Amino acid sequence: MTGFMKGAMILTVAGLLVKVIGAISKVIVARILGGEGVGLYQMAYSLYQLIISIGAAGLPVAISIMIARKVGQEDFRGARHIFKVALTTMGIIGVLLSIGFYLAIPYVIEVGLITDSRAEGALLAVAPAIGIVSLLACFRGYFQGFQNMLPTGISQVCEQLGRVLVMVGAAIYFLPQGIELASSRAALSSVIGVGLGLVVLLYYYGRESKLEGQVYSLESPSKIIQELIVLALPVALANIMIPLIGAIDLWLVPQQLMLSGYGKEEATTAFGYLTGMATSLISLPVIVTMSLATSLVPAISRLHRERDQEEIHHRMRTALRMTNIVTIPAFVGLCVLATPISQMMFNTPNAGGAIAVLSASIWLLGVQQVTTGALQGLGHTAIPMFTLLLGAILKILLNLYLTPQWGIEGAAWATNVDFGIAAIANVYILYRSTSFQVSFIEIGKILFSSLAM
């Protein structure tokens, strides 16, 4: 098994474990704190996730690209120099972000961005985690640059496990003292979780044998920081685009449903079928494709540095083949069995239509993720941001037209077009830049086999 596939497998297993642990914790915490307590916790946690997605989301990709290039030259000293500069820079930025977040909390509540002032304690609790996440991202990017996904995978599981155990324990222990205190102490779990993840990565870093390799002159810190920004910023912007479009949908889709004759409660219910039920089902298979994309970035980056076009094509073909093998049967199966699955999992058959339509996004999003990984590995980190933006603009326009015509299924079709346009644009740009061609015969065979089952 190649290092690329081994890395993807490790990240897939870790991703599934994180999902399972997270799903179990949601049920337990909801039973302990109830809707009110969970709401206070989520107000803080959602804002925290938005901040770290802006501040640190692009770092692992950017650092892994820069490290992989040095590893391809056997310049291990240069790779460690890049890591140390990135770690120092992000350590300082992380501390400043944490302090800024802490000081901004009263104003965030005052202007109404957080509508319940009782969430202040939970917001204060998550502030230190922002600084730690910046360091965590640097370490993960470093190991990914060496195509060593084990530290990243184990740290993700430990982070989630630590967060969940502290969250549940704090919720149980502090609930008798009031829902506000219980939710704020449960929010401390974010700090404990990322802290535990960082300890795991420090352990692996300490164990690592420091290879010397070839000796090259070291780049200046300013040049490293400049390249880091150029690579990381588009990735961070692309990462926040999907939740941003989700926020637009939150306002736009129910409004369009009501314009077509839905009552307020009916529109909210239909929106729940799409975002709370259908979306949750498509998120599981794409764990595999996200892992493939993450593992693909440093592999392609290293090969691109070595100008090994044939091996680049081989890695991309392998990644897309695995994507098709996993996502096409999942898409077909979910589409055909949408209504029974809706009844079994959500105790209503009414989400079946939205699930059936949105199931196509399993394949489309999978292709978009893997081709994004390939483009990032080639150094084109800005392109996936623009292809996602193009898809998002079309999605908004189609929501305005299709949702009043076809109801919630129209909104699901708009989402399919969003991911589909981004995927097609990525594939086209890969063809133009590397002459890589997708095997439509292979896709047809997998689709036919899936339909025949």
Annotated model-derived regions:
Residues 1-21, 77, 81, 219-242, ...:
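N-terminal membrane topogenesis motif
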Residues 29-50, 179, 183, 223-231, ...:
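Interfacial/gating helices of multi-pass transporter permease domains
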Residues 57-72, 282-310, 316-320:
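Helix-loop junctions and terminal segments of transmembrane helices
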Residues 62-106, 121-122, 313-327:
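Membrane-water interface segments that mark the loop-to-transmembrane alpha-helix transition
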Residues 99, 103, 114-138, 332, ...:
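Alpha-helical transmembrane segments of multi-pass membrane proteins
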Residues 133-155, 360-390, 401:
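Membrane-interface junctions at transmembrane-helix termini in multi-pass inner-membrane proteins
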Residues 149-151, 161-199, 382, 392-424:
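Membrane-interface helix-loop junctions in multi-pass transport and translocation proteins
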Residues 239, 244, 441-453:
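Transmembrane alpha-helical segments of multi-pass transport proteins
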